[in-house]
Amino acid sequence: MVYILLAPGFEEAEALVPVDMLRRANIETATVSIIGEPVPGSHGVTVLADVTLDDVDLS
């Protein structure tokens, strides 16, 4: 599993292009909100992440 962390002010292209490419390659990928709610990007695009940081099990 690949986790892409999203924080307020993230650069949309830098986060979402890799997510798109990984998913096209059938690599399990999830976006993670570090604030527990939809995350506003640097260019005004708000992204609803797949999970919140509290939901991620790294063990």
Across the structure, where does each feature detected by a protein language model lie?
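Extended, subdomain-level signal for the structured scaffold at the beginning of enzyme domains
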Residues: 1-59
